[in-house]
Amino acid sequence: MSRPDPEAVEKMHRFFAVECNNRAWELTEQASRSEEETHEMRTNAHAAAYHWAVIGPPVNRMRARMLLAEVAAQDGNGALALSLAQSGCEFFEKEDGTDWDRAFATLELAYAHAVSGQHEEVSSLLEKATARGEQLAEKSEREFFAENHQRISGLIAKL
């Protein structure tokens, strides 16, 4: 079998990065999942991270890490979630992240702190995330952020 040309390979990586990313996020947002869906969520998150690592710019690689932080938090792996979320927040504060990236990373960091049992940081991080979310330029971004904030706040409340 001959190897496809590099441009075709890059397009395939991009296709799978986007598809796996979107499916993993879709599964994280479900109120409940079967064991099979949980496995699918994990697999897609890691696959997305792999494909972005091969072809993505640093910002997309870091967004994939934030997805991994969400999955780790939902799995109850606080140490991993915290490590991934902290690196994401640091990156988006210093690099080319958008206002959305900074707001969402702060929300993920609050969730990771809660799952890690470091509850003293959670309230201030949620407040910071709320303020950042309210300042998003696009109404659709503000609404989507508010939905995620509500979802994650609900998950935190169950801990």
What positions do the PLM features span?
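Amphipathic alpha-helical segments of tetratricopeptide repeats
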Residues: 6, 25, 45-53, 86-94, ...
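Residue signature of alpha-solenoid helical repeat architecture, marking inter-repeat boundaries
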Residues: 11-19, 38-39, 59, 100, ...
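Residue register of alpha-helical TPR repeats
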Residues: 18-19, 63, 104, 143-144
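Helix-turn-helix repeat elements of alpha-solenoid scaffolds
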Residues: 35-47, 77-86, 125
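Alpha-helical linker/edge segments of TPR/alpha-solenoid repeat scaffolds
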Residues: 110-119, 149-159
